[in-house]
Amino acid sequence: MRKINIFDTTLRDGEQSAGINLNLQEKLEIARQLERLGVDIIEAGFPASSKGDFQAVKQIAETIKTCSVTGLARSVQSDIDAAWEALKGGAEPRLHLFIATSPIHMKYKLQMTPEQVIETAVESVKYAKRYFPIVQWSAEDACRSELPFLAKIITEVIKAGATVINIPDTVGYITPKEYGNIFTFLSNNVPNIEKVSLSAHCHDDLGMAVANSLAAIEHGATQIEGTINGIGERAGNAALEEIAVALYIRKDYYQAETRLNLQEIKRTSNLVSKLTGVVIPPNKAVIGKNAFAHESGIHQDGVLKEKTTYEIISPELVGVQSNSMVLGKHSGRHALRNRVEELGYTLSDEEVNKLFVRFKELADKKKDITDDDLVALIFEEKFDHFKDFYQLSSLQVQYGTNQIPTAVVVLKDGQGNEIQEAATGAGSVEALYNTLERCFKTSVTLLDYRIESVSGGRDALAQVFVKVRVNDIETSGRGTAQDVLEASAKAYINAVNRVFMIETMRAENQKVAMQ
């Protein structure tokens, strides 16, 4: 059975989704979970694009031990140099080089002739091979490229030392039959193509990213690129969890397999969703909450008699737990730590101590603490602190029928100074956000607001997700609390803190550029 390598680009292509801005700690946590999932390659970022991306790629490369870490680079020496400095400490450094090959890109974006594009591609691969044992070369917009030219340039980059050839459907234009035919054409028209790995990278603009990826496997691809939950620019990328499960369920047809630990899929999906703020649609294949629900009476009757009548994927296959351990106010620190580790999270002693305090506070108000509650507390303690920016000290909201809602908020800034403001609004949340905007002394546009319960019951934790725009920066934020307004405030502060973090990084990058 053929082995298919899984190339995860959640941290690079996935993060290009509008409003997703992950900090270093969040990227590291996702990378660790991808390692537990068993992906073969993690594309950690674009090292030359910014100081922040460089540091993230470097730390991920030095942290991850059981899979290869790569970074993206344009076909210029400075990008390749930056990528090597970021990746050289990894277990298996590899580079992902790209240049556009379609007529429209060569003419309008690159403003280069086809001959110049070939020369640039060859020289960049030769230069990269001085550093990297594995060089992946991508033909950007390959699916709108002329096939004879595509075969010609691939022939030359293989001669120059490329070890993986990637065929991206950059704009989500191709159909499965056409995409498969490209791989067949290249296999028949590129000398020595059997000496390299062929890779597929599909976007979902026409809703065919997963189907196209599977078609590529049928026609010789041995590496598939995609993201968790299919997140990515525009309509997103191929959803890796769907491809992996399709290969597992239909191994009789595809005769191919991955090395993914499928039981880690749900946990990985939830982690990415919570950290990015991108909600998982309930009808999402493999990991949506309705994926294993049966509404029809006929279906329910069949499933009760024999699950396989209507259920081709068992919830347990992808790590959906039928039950979870419940902790309470009498649970100790040791039980808490054990459960945190069983859930797949690594916390320092200091983080466990802080989490235990939050856990006890919640246990005094809520009888049973479920796994979902615990994960929400972990996220708040581990990822939601921006020590150099704003933190919520207290809030008070006055609301009554036929009264104007009024909010009073006290924040602490990065220097420990208290800021107190008050404002009114048409509703409690608007009053709260108007007050916070005064505290920030900057104009904030709320683009999206979403609330959900973490678990069931009247005493359930509330989790709020927001998306905001400040100047030209869009970010998302999240907040968790038993009180809806407190969760709303935390989410808003979290999102705006991310804006300030990005502005700080931009300023640092400008200083470096001027030196």
UniProtKB/Swiss-Prot annotation:
Native source organism of the sequence: Geobacillus sp. (strain WCH70)
UniProt region (Regulatory domain), positions on chain: 391-515
Family per record: Belongs to the alpha-IPM synthase/homocitrate synthase family. LeuA type 1 subfamily.
Keyword Chloroplast applies: no
Highest classification ranks of the organism: Bacteria, Bacillati, Bacillota, Bacilli, Bacillales
Entries under InterPro entries matching the protein: 2-IPM_HCS-like, 2-isopropylmalate_synth_dimer, AIPM/Hcit_synth_CS, Aldolase_TIM, LeuA/HCS_post-cat, LeuA_allosteric_dom_sf, LeuA_bact_synth, PYR_CT
Entry protein name: 2-isopropylmalate synthase
GO cellular component: cytoplasm
Keywords: Amino-acid biosynthesis, Branched-chain amino acid biosynthesis, Cytoplasm, Leucine biosynthesis, Manganese, Metal-binding, Transferase
Gene name in the database record: leuA
